[in-house]
């Protein structure tokens, strides 16, 4: 039984599915997708549960969410292993994901009060009050790269605000989704407040097409995000929050410490085997001897990276990609760029056929025309050389995406220029592109999102504002508007 609907675990009536470890092919999870009728049922019970949940005092909702945080802490080792085995990422990195999930609780509570909550301003004749109300029934679509943390970033603030939810994990990480929902069950969520439907494209389409949804919160690829945007077009009454990918530039302008710059680049481009939406995809390196030395050192150190199993000892820096098919897609993208005229500096290599273990690749594309403006979700770094900083900014902005952008430089003035001219939601200076703070908004412009950033701003798309002018009693104003006459007329 792999679906959780109205507080009950039930068997899906859709397609049979199984999930294997992307390196060992060990079967980890088996179950059936939710069919359209079960998806509709999940929405119906969420609708029925909404009025009571929304009317709970905030403290009551907060108590359940904090109980969930305590359960995450108590089961950290178990959830770490589930995430690591299912995604292929090393144990150390999966542990950091669970830690981020735990920290998200306190941050979301603070954000609720700071961004939404209730605020009152006293007036001479009463008060002006700002309140926030939940939307209703929301669908949450989760990604596979952070199958616990990223859905958590939607689910927690949405529940705190008083919404009820239908959660569809990625079909590539059903085990993590199920494990997390079991912790929510133990936290004491009332039946119907949060529902789990497993499945792939058909389940997702059935969910996103429901008329009774009040909104959809999505993290994933731009192609799927655009499809959802088209599907919900003409429905302005529904909230749609899209957190999509990027073709992110990292500018290497002035290298005071070569190894530090190489380390920053490795963290930006290859952590999580390149499967973070903020990963550097385009490396812009200034022409000259300093840039040459930096690139040579980068190729040297990156060439030593050996992906490994989730439980290897010692632990590898990177594990496998989410699937062997994902690794093959990266290889095809590299060959395509070679065919366009790219010069390979470090060839990616499959460690073992049939697995998702893939070494990083680096290819120079300076002067190459018609390079696809796409997010290759894996450890492939494209290099361009530039002559001056204005050219670097032009290259950085030469994309339909706008998620993250970074600069390595000792010159603060250059960073100030980048802040003014960069088209990206995250702009870092001498910090990895993959570094982001939950106390700040997380999101991008262009094809990277629809101006609904998550993290600290997630509270904004989980509730709508209600403004009120209030007075405990009704009185006639001392001064009337022109043309109004309330004088008593004598009877004739």
UniProtKB/Swiss-Prot annotation:
EC number: 1.2.1.71
Organism domain of life: Bacteria
Transmembrane intervals: none
InterPro entries named in the record: Ald_DH/histidinol_DH (IPR016161), Ald_DH_C (IPR016163), Ald_DH_CS_CYS (IPR016160), Ald_DH_CS_GLU (IPR029510), Ald_DH_N (IPR016162), Aldehyde_DH_dom (IPR015590), SuccinylGlu_semiald_DH_AstD (IPR017649)
List of catalytic residues: 243, 277
Catalysed reaction equations from the record: N-succinyl-L-glutamate 5-semialdehyde + NAD(+) + H2O = N-succinyl-L-glutamate + NADH + 2 H(+)
Record flagged with keyword Oxidoreductase: yes
Function: Catalyzes the NAD-dependent reduction of succinylglutamate semialdehyde into succinylglutamate.
HAMAP family given in the database record: Aldedh_AstD (MF_01174)
Family note: Belongs to the aldehyde dehydrogenase family. AstD subfamily.
Name listed for the protein in its UniProt record: N-succinylglutamate 5-semialdehyde dehydrogenase
Source organism per UniProt: Salmonella gallinarum (strain 287/91 / NCTC 13346)
């Amino acid at each position: 039984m792999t679906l959780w609907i109205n507080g009950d675990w039930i068997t899906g009536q859709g397609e049979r599915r199984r999930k294997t470890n992307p390196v060992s092919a060990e079967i980890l999870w088996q179950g059936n997708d939710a069919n359209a009728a079960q998806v509709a049922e999940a929405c119906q019970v969420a609708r029925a549960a909404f009025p009571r949940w929304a009317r709970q005092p905030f403290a009551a909702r907060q108590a359940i969410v904090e109980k969930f945080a305590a359960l995450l802490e108590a089961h950290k080792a178990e959830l770490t292993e589930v995430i690591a085995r299912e995604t292929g990422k090393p144990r150390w990195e999966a542990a950091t994901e669970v830690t981020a999930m735990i920290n998200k609780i306190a941050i979301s509570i603070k954000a609720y009060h700071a961004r939404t909550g209730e605020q009152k301003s006293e007036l001479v004749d009463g008060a002006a009050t700002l309140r926030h109300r939940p939307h209703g029934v929301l669908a949450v679509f989760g990604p596979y790269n952070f199958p616990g943390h990223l859905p958590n970033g939607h689910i927690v603030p949405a529940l705190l605000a008083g919404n009820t939810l239908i959660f569809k994990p990625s079909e590539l990480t059903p085990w993590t989704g199920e494990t997390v929902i079991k912790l929510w069950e133990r936290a004491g969520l009332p039946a119907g407040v949060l529902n789990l439907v497993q499945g792939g494209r058909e389940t997702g389409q059935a969910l996103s097409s429901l008329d009774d949804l009040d909104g959809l919160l999505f993290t994933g690829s731009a192609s799927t995000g655009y499809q959802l945007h088209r599907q919900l077009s003409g429905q302005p009454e529904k909230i749609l929050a899209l957190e999509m990918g990027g073709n992110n530039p990292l500018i290497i302008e002035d290298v005071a410490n070569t190894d530090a710059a190489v380390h920053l680049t490795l963290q930006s481009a290859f952590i999580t085997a390149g499967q973070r939406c903020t990963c550097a995809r385009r490396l812009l390196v200034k022409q000259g001897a300093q840039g040459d030395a930096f690139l040579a050192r980068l190729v040297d150190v990156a060439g030593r990276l050996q992906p490994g199993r989730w439980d290897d000892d010692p632990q590898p820096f990177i594990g496998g990609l989410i699937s062997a098919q994902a690794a093959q897609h990266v290889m095809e993208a590299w060959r395509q760029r070679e065919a366009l005229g790219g010069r390979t500096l470090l060839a990616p290599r499959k460690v073992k056929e049939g697995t998702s273990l893939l070494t990083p690749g680096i290819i120079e594309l300076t002067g190459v025309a018609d390079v696809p403006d796409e997010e290759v979700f894996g450890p492939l770094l494209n290099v361009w050389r530039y002559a001056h900083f204005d050219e670097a900014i032009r290259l950085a902005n030469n994309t339909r995406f706008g998620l993250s952008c970074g600069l390595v430089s000792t010159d603060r003035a250059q960073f100030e220029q980048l802040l003014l001219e960069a088209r990206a939601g995250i702009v870092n200076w001498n910090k990895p592109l993959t570094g982001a703070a939950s106390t700040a908004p997380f999101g991008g412009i262009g094809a990277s999102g629809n101006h609904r950033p998550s993290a600290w701003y997630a509270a904004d798309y989980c509730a709508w504002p209600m403004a009120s002018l209030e007075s405990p009693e009704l009185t006639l104003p001392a001064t009337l508007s022109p043309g109004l006459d309330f004088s008593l007329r004598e009877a004739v």
